[in-house]
Design a protein with these regions (language model features):
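Feature captures the catalytic cores and cofactor-binding loops of soluble hydro-lyases/lyases
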Residues: 189-278
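Glycine- and Gly-Pro-enriched alpha-helical subdomains that act as flexible
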Residues: 156, 160-216
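Intrinsically disordered, low-complexity regions enriched in acidic/Ser/Thr/Pro/Gln residues
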Residues: 1-170, 174-175, 179-182
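Catalytic domains of riboflavin
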Residues: 281
Length: 283
């Protein structure tokens, strides 16, 4: 649905002057995701692209991997006591015969807009085996100068951020820097799920020759989502976590952090970057 922003009264103090004015805020509402009729998770998200979000979430969980695994996604009617539809509950039905991994039964069912899914049973439980190994053949060969341009392209494509200043963004780019898709959400993990879910709905998985760029940091969960979708390159404008770096090294994911102008840190998978012209120094 279209409830992306809301208006609220704010008291503004600037240069000693006080005024009252309406302000535009990003909407944050819960979304319950059900799998074959059974509650699975609740995430705090910005409404919009809810079906894609649910599909992308299930890709990261190893439930869905290709378009044929998905039978249907619907909003659940009667979500309130009076029977009205809040458009905050979706039910994903898998195609008969699609295997459902046990990991879906082990999670803490609450997620937040900042950290994503919390309280997994163990680290091993999150290292779900992907059906899309990172096997880009021939390997991508990306010019670092091209990567350096992507944050500005991401920022220019953010529509709601300009009005609220409160949204994260995730975008898919080709290896040549062409913007394929962008999604905004109060949670960066939701923005990634919306991208991946839309790709699944369009039968575009695996995303084997694209670059995923995220605003903010690169957490373990975002690295996992990239791997589960077959994305070979994850770049972030801020820092990665240690677990994200470990996962990238294990799976062959190219992980770039602190992507700001001509500067960047490459934490894993440097074989996909054209570093021939760079001057190598070690400390």
């Amino acid at each position: 649905m279209g409830r992306v922003t809301e208006r609220r009264k704010v008291i503004r103090i600037r240069d000693g002057a006080i005024s009252s004015r309406p302000d535009t805020l990003v909407t944050e509402e819960p979304l319950e995701i059900r799998l074959n009729g059974k509650p699975l998770a609740i995430t705090m998200r910005t409404p919009g692209d809810d079906f894609a979000l649910a599909a992308g979430f299930l890709v990261s969980e190893g439930v869905l991997a290709q378009h044929s695994d998905l039978h249907n996604i619907v909003y659940c009617a009667g979500a309130t006591a009076d029977g009205s539809n809040t458009y905050n509950v979706v039910d994903v039905t898998t195609t008969p015969g699609t295997p459902i991994p046990d990991i879906t039964l082990e999670r803490n069912v609450y997620t937040t807009s900042s950290c994503g899914l919390c309280g997994k049973a163990s680290l091993d439980a999150v290292r779900t085996t992907t059906r899309w190994p990172l096997n880009d053949t021939p390997p991508l060969h990306i010019d670092p100068d091209l990567l350096a341009d992507l944050p500005d392209r991401l920022r220019a494509a953010q529509r709601v951020f300009d009005r609220t200043g409160g949204l994260h963004a995730a975008a898919l780019f080709t290896e040549h820097g062409e913007l394929l898709d962008i999604r905004e959400d109060v949670g960066r993990h939701n923005a990634v799920d919306k991208l991946v879910g839309r790709a699944l709905q369009n039968a575009d998985l695996p995303l084997s020759r694209v670059i995923l760029l995220v605003s903010g940091r690169a957490s373990f969960e975002l690295a996992q989502k990239a791997v589960m979708a077959g994305i070979p390159v994850l770049a972030a404008v801020s820092a990665p976590s240690s677990l994200a770096v470990d996962l990238a090294a294990e799976t062959g994911l190219t992980l770039v952090g602190f992507l700001r102008g001509p500067s960047m840190n490459v934490y894993a998978g440097e074989h996909r970057l054209a570093l021939e012209t760079a001057t190598a120094t070690q400390t």
